[in-house]
Amino acid sequence: MHEQLPLQDRALEARLIELETRLSFQEQALNELSEALADARLTGARNAELIRHLLEDLGKVRSTLFADAVDEPPPPHY
């Protein structure tokens, strides 16, 4: 039975190395996903701010285009 221990130890060591390798890849993937999420959040915040400004500008344009007729100067007389 003592002769089987080195083989068993080698199998356990190989399994441990495989698990450590997988863990390393998982940690790398998690870091990459965290960075991608942070970038997406920044992009979303920038887009929300841009939309807010565009809606403000659109409101100003609408106010100008659809002002009350009372506020308009009279048409020229020919």
From Swiss-Prot:
The organism's place on the tree of life at top rank: Bacteria
Annotated signal sequence range: none
Organism from which the protein derives: Xanthomonas axonopodis pv. citri (strain 306)
Record-stated family: Belongs to the SlyX family.
Protein name: Protein SlyX homolog
Any Pfam family: SlyX
